[in-house]
């Protein structure tokens, strides 16, 4: 148990030891450091080295922003931060600075700003013997009755010496004579008062006047001296000395009393009569300050104010007044004047450190260091400091009337960029006086705001076939910061789609956000694309944001209709067969066309442009179906050529033509063959034979037709494609998107016709297929062909 307690005592003892060490350090920093210098020392003279006294390293004073702060507006000292030397800024006159006060001490502070630390110091000004004793009156007149008995003392005017200490007035001597010797007496104030002592009786008839030289000596090395003539007039006997009613008068007078105010009235009486009883009043042992401040009436003894009083300069006056009768006898009294302090001085504020510009987002940062003072006393000299309540700053009291102005909360330049702070110092006097000091603190910008786009996304419309470098739109971002922190630079961000060639499509002006199309856009190749743009400021570090830009390409009518069927590529044309017995409205074929554009630019209309037999055929305007318009006649030519115009609804409209060949046949017994010109006669002769063969073939083929129909349906369902024989079919490539046509007349599914003609010796074969509809899936399909996709007929002729 004891061992454990011993172990616990050791940390406690250490804690107590550390506490006392820290307490000693704190007291050491508060105790002033003392320095001294002789008065009248030349400016720039060395006083002390603060670097050594404060225990700091070389260069630390400059880094910590050391400075010397003293009361008042006059700087008596200069300080070298680099060397730490404290030098005199000017010659110092101790008498001017301190007057009779001894010791003469000038307090000052050594202020270290970073971190904040104060050191108290005092500069004592040592007196030098630079003033000689001076008598205010070069001639001192004494009227002494001849009846005065030996041993009587006479107080004479003392000399003034502005020096203090050993350099002040120390001794008086009188010239050798038979009647008087000199006696020195110390007053309560420590002043040496010279007195003449009568050695033997005077005889006016023997010597009516005595002249003596009074010499005042100071204690300097070498000593200085001053002389005055003491002239003694021996008068007739006057055996009564004037007596004052009181030996001590105590009065109080406010410091704001006007000039001419009555301070006091002294009164003395003399029992003698005649001239020996006539009393006159005069100052005795009065200093120059008393003579300047007060005026004494020689007849009435009224003490009046000659000039304004100032409590802050002198608080009390001791006035010696002498009453002298006509016979030369005199008595003295003392008037003790106490100046009453009034609150006539407003507080004073001295700014030591001020930082006018501070970055935002800082907290607990020092803005200013200042001191306050009030020359008044008591409550008149007590002060309180304050600033406005609605500011993010607070005042922190320091040592000996020093205050620091500190940031309480982080500043935001975007909310407020400038603060006008009024520091108010008020005393507790009546009435209360105050001093206001205004400072302006500018908040410098920190890059704490990223650029913000005016929109999170932008939609731009560009018509296709635009010219390269076309301005297609703009993006805009703003930054709440200022200066370079608010300068925004725009850029294109890498696209999310790796296959999008963004760098070749658009560019952006880095300064103003203008977007340009780098190439001519094609709606049919690219209808829309999107990308991201970034906006970055030029702060450090730079902040950025991004926005989405969507570009929609508007279609232009730059594609003509494309005819899918019948194919117009120069190959052998397909020939449509129409029986002569066809009724009006018989579907001959259908012109199928598409348009690569969109919208109304892809709305197609059809019209019959040319025909071998006008009025025989008609074309439906919206779906391109070619139908018979009337019954066929015998005189109608067997070969019909139709030109169908396909036109879109664009502005201006574009068009294409399709050429159809129609063969009019009497039933399907004999196809029309391109034979030599000599064949028509023979064909007419064999017309009956053809009809018979057709009838026989029809009957014979009924069975085969059923079988073929079943097989065709099976094959179509499996392969989803039409069986193609030796015939003229649409050839050549066409884009898949051309099949995708809305309900504007262009089919959503393809028609395919087969016409096969085979010529040979004695055998002719004709095959007619109804439209075969492949399994194409297209957008916007309007309808499906009315014909059965699996329907097939086959006719054979021999």
UniProtKB/Swiss-Prot annotation:
One cellular component (GO) term of this entry: synapse
MF terms (GO), sorted A to Z: calcium ion binding
Annotated Cadherin domain residues: 37-135, 136-244, 249-349, 354-453, 458-563, 570-673
CDD domains referenced in this protein's UniProt entry, alphabetically: Cadherin_repeat (cd11304)
UniProt keyword Glycoprotein present: yes
Residues annotated as signal peptide: 1-30
Domain of life assignment: Eukaryota
Modified residues (N6-acetyllysine): 299
Membrane topology type: Single-pass type I membrane protein
Natural source organism: Homo sapiens (Human)
Cytoplasmic side: 714-798
Compartments, as annotated in UniProt: Cell membrane
TM stretches of this protein: 693-713
Protein name in the entry: Protocadherin beta-2
Extracellular side: 31-692
Entry-linked SUPFAM superfamilies: Cadherin-like
Pfam families: Cadherin (PF00028), Cadherin_2 (PF08266), Cadherin_C_2 (PF16492)
Function: Potential calcium-dependent cell-adhesion protein. May be involved in the establishment and maintenance of specific neuronal connections in the brain.
Keyword line: Acetylation, Calcium, Cell adhesion, Cell membrane, Glycoprotein, Membrane, Repeat, Signal, Transmembrane, Transmembrane helix
Lineage: Eukaryota, Metazoa, Chordata, Craniata, Vertebrata
Glycosylation sites: 171, 420, 438, 569
GO BP annotations listed: calcium-dependent cell-cell adhesion via plasma membrane cell adhesion molecules; cell adhesion; chemical synaptic transmission; homophilic cell adhesion via plasma membrane adhesion molecules; nervous system development; synapse assembly
């Amino acid at each position: 148990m004891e061992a454990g307690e011993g172990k616990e005592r050791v940390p406690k003892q250490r804690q107590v030891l550390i506490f006392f060490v820290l307490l000693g350090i704190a007291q050491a920093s508060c105790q002033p450091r003392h320095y001294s210098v002789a008065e009248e020392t030349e400016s720039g003279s060395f006083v002390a080295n603060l670097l050594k006294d404060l225990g700091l390293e070389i260069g630390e004073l400059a880094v910590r922003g050391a400075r010397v702060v003293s009361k008042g507006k006059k700087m008596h000292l200069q300080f070298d931060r680099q060397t730490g030397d404290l030098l005199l800024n000017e010659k110092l006159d101790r008498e001017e600075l301190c007057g009779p006060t001894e010791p003469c001490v000038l307090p000052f502070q050594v202020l270290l700003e970073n971190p904040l630390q104060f050191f108290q110091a005092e500069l004592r000004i040592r007196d030098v013997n630079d003033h000689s004793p001076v008598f205010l009156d070069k001639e001192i007149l004494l009227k002494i009755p001849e009846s005065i008995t030996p041993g009587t003392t006479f107080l004479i005017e003392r000399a003034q010496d502005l020096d203090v200490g050993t350099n002040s007035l120390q001794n008086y001597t009188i010239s050798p004579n038979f009647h008087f010797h000199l006696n020195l007496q110390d007053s309560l104030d420590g002043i040496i008062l010279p007195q003449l002592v009568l050695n033997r009786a005077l005889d006016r008839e023997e010597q009516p006047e005595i002249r003596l030289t009074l010499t005042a000596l100071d204690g300097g090395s070498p000593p200085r001296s001053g002389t005055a003539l003491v002239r003694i007039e021996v008068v007739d006997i006057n055996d009564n000395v004037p007596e004052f009613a009181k030996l001590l008068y105590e009065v109080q007078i406010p410091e704001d009393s006007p000039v001419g105010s009555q301070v006091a009235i002294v009164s003395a009486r003399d029992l003698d009569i005649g001239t020996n009883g006539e009393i006159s009043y005069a100052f005795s042992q009065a200093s120059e300050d008393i003579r300047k401040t007060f005026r004494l009436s020689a007849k009435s003894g009224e003490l009046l104010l000659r000039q304004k009083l100032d409590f802050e300069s002198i608080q009390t006056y001791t006035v010696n007044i002498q009453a002298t009768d006509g016979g030369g006898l005199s008595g003295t009294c003392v008037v003790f004047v106490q100046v009453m302090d009034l609150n006539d001085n407003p507080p004073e504020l001295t700014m030591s450190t001020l930082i006018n510009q501070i970055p935002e987002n800082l907290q607990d940062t020092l803005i200013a260091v200042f001191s306050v003072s009030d020359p008044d006393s008591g409550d008149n000299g007590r002060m309180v400091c304050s600033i406005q309540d609605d500011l993010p700053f607070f005042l922190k009291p320091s040592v000996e009337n020093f205050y620091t102005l500190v940031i309480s909360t982080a500043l935001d330049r975007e909310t407020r960029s400038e603060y006008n702070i009024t520091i108010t110092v008020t005393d507790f006097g009546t009435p209360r006086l105050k001093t206001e000091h205004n400072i302006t603190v500018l908040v410098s910008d920190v890059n704490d705001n990223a650029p913000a786009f005016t929109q999170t996304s932008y939609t731009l419309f560009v018509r296709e076939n635009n010219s390269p470098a076309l301005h297609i739109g703009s993006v805009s971002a703003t930054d709440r910061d200022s200066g370079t922190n608010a300068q925004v630079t725009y850029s294109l961000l890498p696209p999310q789609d790796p296959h999008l060639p963004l760098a070749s499509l658009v560019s952006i002006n880095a300064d103003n956000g203008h977007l340009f199309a780098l190439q001519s856009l094609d709606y049919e190749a690219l209808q829309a694309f999107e990308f991201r743009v970034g906006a970055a400021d030029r702060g450090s570090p730079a902040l950025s944001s991004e926005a989405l830009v969507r570009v929609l390409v508007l279609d232009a009518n730059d594609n003509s209709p494309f005819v899918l069927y019948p194919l117009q590529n120069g190959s052998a044309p397909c020939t449509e067969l129409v029986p002569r017995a066809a009724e009006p409205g018989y579907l001959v074929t259908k012109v199928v066309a598409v348009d690569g554009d969109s919208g109304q630019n892809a709305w197609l209309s059809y019209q019959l442009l040319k025909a071998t037999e006008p009025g025989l055929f008609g074309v439906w305007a919206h779906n391109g179906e070619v139908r018979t318009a009337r019954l066929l006649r015998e005189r109608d030519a067997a070969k019909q050529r139709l030109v169908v115009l396909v036109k879109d609804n664009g502005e201006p409209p574009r068009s294409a033509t399709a050429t159809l060949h129609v063969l009019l046949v009497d039933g399907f017994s004999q196809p029309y063959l391109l034979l030599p010109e000599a064949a028509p006669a023979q064909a007419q002769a064999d017309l009956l034979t053809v009809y018979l063969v057709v009838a026989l073939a029809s009957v014979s083929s009924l069975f085969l037709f059923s079988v073929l129909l079943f097989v065709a349906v099976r094959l179509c369902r499996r392969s989803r494609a039409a069986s193609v024989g030796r015939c003229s079919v649409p050839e050549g490539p066409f884009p898949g998107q051309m099949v995708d046509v809305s309900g504007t007349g262009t089919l959503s599914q393809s028609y395919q016709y087969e016409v096969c003609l085979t010529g040979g010796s004695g055998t002719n074969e004709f095959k007619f297929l109804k439209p075969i509809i492949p399994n194409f899936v297209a957008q916007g399909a309007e309808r499906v062909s009315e014909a059965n996709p699996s329907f097939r007929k086959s006719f054979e002729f021999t």
